[in-house]
Amino acid sequence: MKDRIKEYLKEKGRVTVNDLAQALGKDGSKDFRELIKTLSLMERKHQIRFEEDGSLTLDQKKKHEITLKGTFHAHKNGFGFVSLEGEEDDLFVGKNDVNYAIDGDTVEVVIKKVADRNKGTAAEAKIIDILEHSLTTVVGQIVLDEEKPKYAGYIRSKNQKISQPIYVKKPAIQLDGTEVLKVFIDKYPSKKHDFFVASVLDVVGHSTDAGIDVLEVLESMDIVSEFPEAVLKEAESVPDAPSEKDMEGRLDLRDEITFTIDGADAKDLDDAVHIKPLKNGNIELGVHIADVSYYVTEGSALDKEALNRATSVYVTDRVVPMLPERLSNGICSLNPQVDRLTQSAIMEINKQGRVVNYTITQTVIKTSFRMTYSDVNDILAGDEEKRQDYKKIVPSIELMAKLHETLESMRIKRGALSFDTNEAKILVDKKGKPVDIVLRHRGVAERMIESFMLIANETVAEHFSKLDLPFIYRIHEEPKAEKVQKFIDYASSFGLRIYGTASEISQEALQDIMRAVEGEPYADVLSMMLLRSMQQARYSEHNHGHYDLAADYYTHFTSPIRRYPDLLVHRMIRDYGRSKEVAEHFEQVIPEIATQSSNRERRAIEAEREVEAMKKAEYMEEFVGEEYDAVVSSIVKFGLFVELPNTVEGLIHITNLPEFYHFNERDLTLRGEKSGITFRVGQQIRIRVERADKMTGEIDFSFIPSEFDVIEKGLKGSGRKDRGRRSDKKEDKRKAGHSSDKRKHSSKDKKKKSKKPFYKEVAKKGAKHGKGRGKGRRAK
């Protein structure tokens, strides 16, 4: 019907709906309703448009108009950017040119103004068509509203990039205003109505429920904890233990001294190791991974759901697993003293850390001990009580530590980069309220297991690459020269000597930079800046190596319980072992799986960051008014981001500084025009917590003059345009909290109320100034 409508409009130009219905023979009541639905859909896709008099026309572009297709990234203040595939620079879209596009929409644009590299201005574009809406569901608390009696009320969403209200149709159930709802978008904002219209899909919970804030974030990203009934039914059919038949044809390693090393609270123990010295002076290392693919067969309900999720999601107070607990905490968990099916990479490693021989095969193991990182670290530190308790495996642990040193040294020599940035764990009570933020400590045990997982992943990837079979790789491409240049410029401002240009700088040169700043107050910040200059690792059917690890071959083999690519690798190991004829099948499915897994990983990271920001802001609400020593973590044109020792980061907006400040983009500094006070990344300063907003995840600080301040006289030539200025508006006063010896509270009874922050002011989409919590080991 759509083609007939288009042909008719093309011929007639402008027609009424009734004329169109008669021409198409759709003027009967049932056919007319079908026509109206089709027209509504075509209007949403910008294929037709309704004129002010109600008539219809084709929504055509101007002749000879060059258009581009891209993804729109909205800013909460109304403007946005459009990213084009394969292009480094984004197009700026002004508030009046957004044309009702929503963050994430696929859009068509025309160029209004070309970029001016001399002035440093971006190209400007206008959105002329929305090709596909990204937002189909929204989660938030219902606000009952009688202003529009046709609707039950509107949704209060955490998504700050949605500027228009979302009105909800009256559902069959009675609402009291405490419900957190998941709604489906029926109508998007347009010239006719500047708001969304949505229908209730589900009641996620109530505002008084414990942990509802985290659940709201997860549900808004379609990260769902509950598994479909068919998936749970399949999981229940999996036995509690492998049978003798299951073990047929497997290498039996149950007599090897094998054990797991994990965090104390880990339940899904999916990797175990064994080690022994060989007569020729080399070391045999066995990395044994739960054979999840034996139970999750291709095409099953379990497999389809695992691919849909593609990864487990780890947030502050919960895990949303890729697989049901029946598997992950049951038969696929390598618990001590029980038989378990595994896939193993058994490697002979020489004194230089090179794998000189290996076997990749299906095995059966029985772990001797369930070790924790703290236990292993204590043993290596000489704890006699622990060494006595685990005397059977102390020699193995000591040999593992020795091998780890060899492997780590090997990676460093070949150019692997190490980003040792602080990571924090947010501790919450039973109601989900944050009670403390503690730094994570990575000891020898944690780094040792990471070394073993890395070498196993490399060995498996190299094996299949050399067989020239279709395979899935974990790739990390070289960083863009533009981003590396910014890092070089900044590192040079500390007096560091840089060897090589941005397009040619070696990994060894980057290593030298990081070694040169070890122990300096700005070392962590510089490490984070280097990390931000890197591209994001992803999955691909093509092997492009792993820049961060300086590895020619890399994949993910070691965590099939929580990552789908690892599950696929296990499946390929088994299937290729039987016949190479399955190559054509894998060649077809791998690209889609790689894309899905990369996208789901990015979604998981976004969820983790959003929850972390929310919980950190909630934690800091109690400390508004307190003063702390902090470190400048990032400087931008509109202010400076400052990090506390517990990794909490906040913004000091330039309008809240006491004078004009010049921004030097090359050196990333802000310098006071009169006082000469200069802020640099890595510099220690004194701050006061002014505002913490759980809803937005934003934290505002103010600058307190102190003995840390650096004064640099003789300011040269920054233009007036880069200067910050005091706000001319009078600011409200409010009482500070009571003083506390422990918290070093300000002695003042009154303090300024901070202005609402303007984060990412005219910044490109995707710029991140806060630290995201990494997965730690096994996440590269």
What annotation goes with each model-predicted range?
Residues 22-25, 160-164, 169-173, 182, ...:
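Electropositive polyanion-binding surfaces
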Residues 105, 125, 653-699, 711-717:
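Intrinsically disordered, low-complexity linker and terminal regions at domain boundaries
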Residues 109, 183, 635, 687-689:
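A generic structural signal for residues embedded in beta-strands
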Residues 204, 702-709:
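Short beta-strand-to-coil "C-cap" segments at the C-terminal boundary of structured domains/repeats
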